């Protein structure tokens, strides 16, 4: 049976928690798909780049610029940090 595990982006930012989780996943959940967030990372990156983030009822409104930032945060920063921790 394959398990799908979703973790939030804030967890990825905490190295101690991330490393503990990755150790646990490696030991216990071999047949798993790990899905990660990264909204907080996208927000931080947007702020650094001076790109205004619009939120409505806790949901990010994604225009062209914020979509580019989201791709950088999710596919770059968050993903690479998670993969490095799993290796």
Regions found by a protein language model. Give the residues of each.
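Nucleotide/pyrophosphate-binding catalytic subdomain
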Residues: 1-87
